[in-house]
From Swiss-Prot:
Residue numbers binding S-methyl-5'-thioadenosine: 33, 108, 140-141, 165
Listed name of the protein: Polyamine aminopropyltransferase
Protein purpose: Catalyzes the irreversible transfer of a propylamine group from the amino donor S-adenosylmethioninamine (decarboxy-AdoMet) to putrescine (1,4-diaminobutane) to yield spermidine.
Binding site for spermidine: 64, 88, 158-161
Gene: speE
Length: 286
């Protein structure tokens, strides 16, 4: 792709978003995905896989703070965390901010994503790959959760959309494997698309997760470059109380963790679980 051209996202056929490409930093088709990273004056460095925006320097903090701090602070004493995907390192960066976490395992299917992001998205990983608690496993996420002997307190599925390599991370086999390696009272979260445009994705995840967890729901955040509205995150656990903790408990845990965030705060934590009526209606109808 030439510089000073427009890059158009291909996630939707009838509409979408575009970015002016000021400078192409990297573009290569790996064994699994077509990766590109370019610079844009408004959003900084932009990474896309198979024609779909995955992250930008400008707004990535919203996604990663909400995917990390909501489950970790709701759990309250997570020691062992599993990240599925997350090769850009930003999810890892946020998990490492929790000093009580003892081990962080990241399973990424494509080693090329990790090496590429270490070089071209240094602000995302911010040196977190060098944290002594971190272990990188190059493997398919479904295979890992169904074969590992490790168990975890929190599992974060930082998956792509359910097409191509990311499709397997929306299957019953994956969700069953996650339940298998979650400790009692553990929490599973996953990105679940923009529900206004991808409602079937949320409904499908809810239906499948409900076979394995007693408390299944969603929480949300507004992320500008995930086009089409509010981003939805799946939530699943067998400890029904964790989704309904008081603001005082979350505030105390947030203060004890010493976190300084740009988007997440205890009030956002509670409000994020309030869902639009159209999603409630769709969930009730299935």
């Amino acid at each position: 792709m030439a510089e000073n051209t427009m890059w158009h996202e291909t996630l939707h056929d009838q509409f979408g978003q575009y970015f002016a490409v000021d400078n192409v930093l990297y573009h290569e088709k790996t064994d699994h995905q077509d990766l590109i990273i370019f610079e844009n004056a408004a959003f900084g460095r932009v990474m896309a896989l198979d024609g779909v925006v995955q992250t930008t320097e400008r707004d990535e903090f919203i996604y990663h703070e909400m995917m990390t701090h909501v489950p970790l602070l709701a759990h309250g004493h997570a020691k062992h965390v599993l990240i599925i995907g997350g090769g850009d390192g930003a999810m890892l960066r946020e998990v490492t901010r929790h000093k009580n976490v003892e081990t962080i395992t990241m399973v990424e299917i494509d080693a090329g994503v990790v090496s590429f992001c270490r070089q071209y998205l240094p602000n995302h990983n911010a040196g977190s790959y060098d944290d002594p608690r971190f272990t990188l496993v190059i493997d398919d996420g479904v295979n890992f959760v169904n074969q590992t002997h490790q168990t975890f307190d929190v599992i974060i599925s930082d998956c792509t959309d359910p097409i191509g390599p990311g499709e397997s991370l929306f299957t019953s086999a994956f969700y069953e494997g996650c339940k298998r390696c979650l400790n009692p009272g553990g929490i599973f979260v996953a990105q679940n698309g923009v529900c206004f445009l991808q409602q079937d994705e949320a409904l499908d995840s809810h239906r499948k997760l409900s076979h394995y967890f007693s408390d299944v729901g969603f929480y949300q955040a507004a992320i500008p470059t995930y086009y089409g509205g509010i981003m939805t995150f799946a939530w699943a656990t067998n400890n029904d109380a964790l989704r309904h903790l008081s603001s005082e408990i979350i505030q105390a845990r947030f203060h004890a963790a010493g976190l300084k965030c740009r988007y997440y705060n205890p009030a956002i934590h509670a409000a994020a679980f309030a869902l639009p009526q159209y999603l409630h209606d769709a969930l009730s109808a299935q």
